[in-house]
Each structure stands twice: as structure tokens, then as C-alpha cells.
């Protein structure tokens, strides 16, 4: 542990007022030191919302290194800390948080947590996914976001679904035009039928952004720049075991869907995916 990190942690531990605690956590978060992750996660449990917000911001800055301990925190019974952890996972966009965000976005009782998860589904780091797994993951995200847009009673969560759908639409526009059309149809319905003016306005912005994306896809120069960008971005810190875990979680979702719908599905699809992922990572 460096002297600087030790001093920053000591300031958090010795803070004797809400104000000093907030300042200490903010300073620790701003340092962007991986050694601070355990203390930042501990701060999510403090009875200090400002410190929790600062911790979430710091964990997001630290990115994927913070994901394993955040996922461990989800197994604990402190709902307040769990809610803040979900906000951090949503902001990081690491694929290991995907299945958690899918469940939270559609079922958590706290609207602020659902809202964070919904936005996180749209901004997932899709370029990290192996080609064999990206399609099924994006399909699950699309289903969850459409469900929220159509069913959630809280307008702030539906508003977030527009943001999430916009981000997802931009990510899948070229590879999945059918899905893009589904999103555009949902936007058209919301722009006409949603009773909240703010949502209709945000839908209008999303439609404009999508139109710009569609125009860009028609540009040869844009295609070349995207190819370069994807080559640079596709490096992922996840291991083959991480991807296998994600695949297993998605398979379980599909299995439950088959049980509920009475459909047999095709488990061979997942067997082929598992084989492809193993081969890709060897």
C-alpha cells in the first residue's frame, strides 16, 4: 500500500462528521487507486448518501477491477449497499454485471435502482463480448428494455428505458435491422401515447440520434473508422471462465423462459456457443 493510499484511507476511517466523511471518500475516489476498492465498497454501507454517491463514482472510474467485489456485495443482505452496488455496476458496463442488471431492471422494487439498471443495459460494453455470445446477450437486453418501456408504471424508469433503447439501437443498428425496427416502433408508440411530456420529448431526441446513426452507416468512411475503433476497443479483461459463467447465466434465463412459455427451445445453440467460446479463448 502506498503512502498516499494509506493516508486517504486513514482520513476515511478517522472522519468524525458527515462532512469530513464525505470529503474523505471524495478524495479517495478521485485518486483512482485500485487499492481503494475495498474501502469504497465499504462506504456504500455508510449512512451517508453523499459518501455513497462519491464511492459509486470512484468505482465506476476504476472500472472492471471493481466488478468482482461488487458482485460479492450483491449476495449480502444490506439492501442499501446492494442498491448502490447496482448503480456502480450499471455505470461500469462490464459484461459480468449483465444478468444482474437484467433482473433488477425488470423486477426491483426501488424505482431509482431500476432506472440505473435500465440505463446500464443500454451502455453495456458490447464490444467486449465474443461474437458468439453478443447476439443472445443483446436480445435479452432488448427484451428487458422493451418490457420496461411498455410496462413500468414510473415515468422516470420509462424515461431511462428510452435512453437505454437509444444506446442499444446504436450498437445493433447495422447487425440487427429487425431489432432496430422494433425499437423504432416502440419509440413511435411512446411519442404518440405516453402521457408524460418529458418522455415524448426524449423519444424525439432518440429518434433524431438514430436517424443520424442510420445516415452514418451509409457512409463508407464511417465503416472504415468503425472497423479501426472496434479493433482497438475489443480487448477485454474477462477470461474464458468469465464468459462461460455469463453464458450459463443466460442459459438459465432461457431455460426459465422455456418453462414459462411451454416451449422446448434449442439447447444445442448454447452447446455450440460454449464450444465456440472455449475455442476462441484458448
UniProtKB/Swiss-Prot annotation:
Pfam family, one: HEAT_2
GO cellular component, one term: phycobilisome
Subunit relationships: CpcE and CpcF associate to form a lyase.
InterPro entries in the record: ARM-like, ARM-type_fold
Single Gene Ontology MF annotation: lyase activity
Gene it is expressed from: cpcF1
Keyword Protease: no
Organism: Pseudanabaena tenuis (strain PCC 7409)
Role according to the record: Required for the chromophorylation of the CpcA gene product.
EC identifiers of the protein: 4.-.-.-
Protein name (Swiss-Prot/TrEMBL): Phycocyanobilin lyase subunit beta
Entry keyword set: Antenna complex, Lyase, Phycobilisome
UniProt keyword Lyase, yes or no: yes
Family the UniProt entry places it in: Belongs to the CpcE/RpcE/PecE family.
